[in-house]
Amino acid sequence: MSFSRETVAKSFLWKLFERFSVQIIQFVVTIVLARLIVPSEYGIISLIAIFIQLCEVIIEGGLNTALVQKKDADNKDFSTIFFFSVGVSFLLYWVMFFAAIPIARFYSQPTLVPVIRILSVNLLFYAINSIQRAYVSKHMLFGKLFYSSFFSVILSGIIGITMAYKGFGVYALVAQAISNQLFTTIIMAFTVRWRPDFVFSGERFKPLFGYGWKIFGTSFIITLFVNARKLVIGKFFQPATLAFYEKGDQIPSLVMSNIFTSIQAILFPVFSEDQDDRPKIKSMMKRSTKMSCLVIYPLLMGLIVVAEPLVSLLLTDKWLPAVPFIRILCISYFFMPITLSNWEAIKAMGYSDITLKLEILKKVIDVLILVVSVFYGVYAIAWGAVLYNFICLFINLWPNKKLLDYSIREQISAAVPSLLISLVMGAAIYWMHILPISRLALLSSQIVLGAIVYISICYLTKEESFMYLLGLLKNNYKRILFKRS
């Protein structure tokens, strides 16, 4: 199976549209819920989400990635992994059921017990949906993925908001999470129409597991240590403090996850198909890095500048303690676009052992930074994330210096134009906070001026990725007009 440039472009646009539309709706739902539910109850869900995410990584086991990476994967492969994942999800549910009490004791939060036991039901739905998503990614069916994500987030949002309005508190968040995963799984069953055969092949499972366990190890380590700061904050600080940190990470993460997930979903299957054509992979990596930075950097810079009026208007002043975390963690995210396509290329070329070894090295560094920073307070923990991502930038870029003859300097230079233009944009809108205008007027003015400044500079300087994207949009527009005529 080989994907044309047009197929890749359409798939990327579908995936990006799906992520943005879903996240915009989810963001609106979050705003409403944040106004109805106090930060401390959000903190309770944040504590539980850490353990649920770890269980989800175990359920996937890197096997869904292995299905996408395998060139000739058929329904026997998908069915084998499907039944394995479902079996693991049942086992993990009971692990979480009995672990609920010790987890609650660890955090001195007895209210966690029933919430953990109810929310863990999501693991079964996640197991089914993980294989559905692997099938979609393998066959570039991202248009179908849009419908399940779009309608499920609307329906679950209605349920969550209704329950929050009725005073259910933390259980409104639980109901929203479960219904979202349930609706996604059900709708995808109708739109994708993939069905497992009643078969489990040990012969097929062995090579998939041989590749997947390394991806699993990498993903588990990443998930554990991404949440390590939240675990520490949840243990040594109040749930409300964790909620502020979580919200501070959630807002820039909204920007990152939409674009990263879209790019990641497209790059991995494409890289896997061309895994033997190293010059082509290098060229695509360079293009994807530039495109990622073109979109992500101005959004992160904008968030740093407008964080205070944004939080005050959308979430109310009770969430203003999240503003410093938003700004600090936005800086942390600046290093990540450079490594995304790099990481996907290494996995697609079959070097999952390299990703595992490097993750172990990085997490040793992360532990050292976290252990030191925890003694200096919650803001030091956040700045520790910045230091960690800066160090990881060079660790992540090192392998492709040898594998693809792609130097670290060359990889970093791909991000420089977008970074410089974003800094100019940030400086142009920062001064506006001194104007004697309302927060709504300030926020609106900064967004409009920022967009004008960024786009104008990109156009006047003929920034490569901007002109490429502009040309792509023009060609698609002409094609649509031609079809209509």
What is each residue range found by the language model?
Residues W398-K401, Y406-I408, A415, A427-S485:
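Membrane-proximal transmembrane or re-entrant/amphipathic helices at the cytosolic face
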Residues M1-S4, V8, G143, I186-N227, ...:
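Interhelical loop/hinge segments that connect adjacent transmembrane helices in multipass membrane
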Residues R5-A9, A66-N75, F125-S148, K166, ...:
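Membrane-interface junctions at transmembrane-helix termini in multi-pass inner-membrane proteins
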Residues M1-F27, T65-F83, L112, G143-K144, ...:
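N-terminal membrane topogenesis motif
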Residues F3-L63, F84-P102, R117-S120, S152-I161, ...:
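Signature of the first transmembrane helix
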Residues V113-S120, S148-R193, P207-Y211, T218, ...:
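Hydrophobic alpha-helical transmembrane segments
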Residues E56-N75, S137-K138, G248, P252-I296, ...:
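Helix-loop junctions and terminal segments of transmembrane helices
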Residues S11-V22, Q26, L173-N180, T184, ...:
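Transmembrane helical elements of multi-pass membrane transporters/channels
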